[in-house]
């Protein structure tokens, strides 16, 4: 049987695009704490010495945008000009306006159940039984490497680590089963003084080995640790960052399709975000129920219309029942209207800043990761 390779990447919380995502979602969380009915579309741009926060927000809440932005940057770890970005001295610009009343007219309804979608669009959700969190292994472990980098950096164990970092893992599959890790790429920003030898050794011992299962590593596994040999200039000084530019990192690492809509900075009335979470919830419950080994869901919506305009299921030949049966079970067990899915997943709560780094899926404490519908799906399928 032929060996197939598949690769996914992740980025750290200090990556410029992720700084922007976290600021946008921090603004959303602070608003939702005060005003659950707020309409928020918050975008952030970061570059050397500045953060620009803009977008369209309609709310009764008041948020100190400047202070909140500085706090997020500080929490990430950009606290000194030596890093090229300093939470205490960077400029913070506020360019927030109000959401168009034309959109409000299409979304708001006297009967909440008839709340229309905030925009048209397509959303995908995916699940696979190749990991215990029912996510693809490459993106799952790429995220875990980045979480470990932040943990080691913040503990001071490797005091030369800096916030910006990226990981990339290539997994080898045979007959759709993991047989090993073919390549590990990890690049991390670092202080000027550390040698390449010490950096490679530290990353291998403190970041890579504690995270990657040893049974997937072999003498044939290739390692690329800071392959350029130098990564001192990073963060917003190295590259500008924008909200919503890491949509594959945020989802399935390329293992499933993507509708194109980003998540961060958007309140749950935006189906780009909430329906993508619901699609993951549906797919995960189908796999958890044993109805398929892999499952991809597509949802679509029209602006101002409550019911989804389509539901598609693909199980890649792994389904225990037909795709048509699965679609019927979805209609019977999940309310995928905007208000219905918001209520079903309890989305009006300040949980979004945490989603903005290390992936939105495969982290069990988020409500869309529950598998509470699996039993009903099994029963409905007659299994």
From Swiss-Prot:
PROSITE patterns attached to this UniProt entry: ADOMET_SYNTHASE_1, ADOMET_SYNTHASE_2
Span list, region Flexible loop: 99-109
GO molecular function: ATP binding; magnesium ion binding; methionine adenosyltransferase activity
Location within or outside the cell: Cytoplasm
Cofactor-binding details, from the entry: Binds 2 divalent ions per subunit.
Binding site residues for K(+): 43
Needed cofactors: Mg(2+); K(+)
Keywords, alphabetical: ATP-binding, Cytoplasm, Magnesium, Metal-binding, Nucleotide-binding, One-carbon metabolism, Potassium, Transferase
Record-listed L-methionine binding positions: 56, 99, 239, 270
PANTHER family linked to this entry: S-ADENOSYLMETHIONINE SYNTHETASE
Complexes and interactors: Homotetramer; dimer of dimers.
Function: Catalyzes the formation of S-adenosylmethionine (AdoMet) from methionine and ATP. The overall synthetic reaction is composed of two sequential steps, AdoMet formation and the subsequent tripolyphosphate hydrolysis which occurs prior to release of AdoMet from the enzyme.
Family statement drawn from the similarity comment of this UniProt entry: Belongs to the AdoMet synthase family.
Protein name per Swiss-Prot or TrEMBL: S-adenosylmethionine synthase
Lineage of the species this protein comes from: Bacteria, Pseudomonadati, Pseudomonadota, Gammaproteobacteria, Pasteurellales
């Amino acid at each position: 049987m032929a060996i197939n390779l598949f690769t996914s990447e992740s980025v750290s919380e200090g990556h410029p695009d992720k700084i922007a995502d976290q600021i946008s979602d921090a603004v959303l969380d602070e608003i939702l704490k005060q005003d659950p009915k707020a309409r928020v579309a918050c975008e952030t741009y970061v570059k050397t010495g500045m953060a620009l926060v803009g977008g369209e927000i309609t709310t009764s809440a008041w948020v100190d945008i400047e202070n909140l932005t500085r706090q997020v940057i500080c929490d990430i770890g950009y606290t000194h000009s030596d890093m090229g970005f300093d939470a205490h001295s960077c400029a913070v610009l506020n360019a927030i306006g109000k959401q168009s009343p034309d959109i409000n007219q299409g979304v708001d309804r006297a009967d909440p159940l008839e709340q229309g979608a905030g925009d048209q669009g397509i959303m995908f959700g995916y699940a696979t039984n190749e990991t215990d969190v029912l996510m693809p292994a490459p993106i799952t472990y790429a995220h875990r490497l980045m979480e470990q980098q932040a943990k080691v950096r913040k503990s001071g164990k490797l005091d030369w680590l800096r916030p910006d970092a990226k990981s990339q893992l290539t997994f080898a599959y045979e007959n759709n089963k993991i047989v090993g890790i073919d390549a590990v790429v990890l690049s991390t920003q670092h202080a000027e003084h550390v040698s390449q030898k010490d950096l490679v050794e530290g990353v291998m011992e403190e970041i890579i080995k504690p995270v990657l299962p040893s049974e997937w590593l072999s003498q044939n596994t290739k390692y690329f640790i800071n392959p350029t040999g130098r990564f001192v200039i990073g963060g917003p000084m190295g590259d500008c960052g924008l909200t919503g530019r890491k949509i594959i990192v945020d989802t399935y690492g390329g293992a499933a399709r993507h509708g194109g809509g980003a998540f961060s900075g958007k309140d749950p009335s935006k189906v780009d975000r909430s329906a993508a979470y619901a699609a993951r919830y549906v797919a995960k419950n189908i796999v958890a129920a044993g109805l398929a080994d892999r499952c991809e869901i597509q949802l679509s919506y029209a602006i101002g219309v409550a019911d989804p305009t389509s539901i598609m299921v693909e199980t890649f030949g792994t389904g225990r029942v037909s795709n048509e049966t699965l679609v019927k079970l979805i209609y019977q067990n999940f309310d995928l209207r905007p208000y219905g899915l918001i209520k079903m997943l309890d989305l009006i709560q300040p949980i979004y800043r945490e989603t903005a780094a290390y992936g939105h899926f495969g982290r069990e404490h988020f409500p869309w990761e529950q598998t509470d519908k699996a039993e009903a799906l099994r029963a409905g399928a007659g299994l």
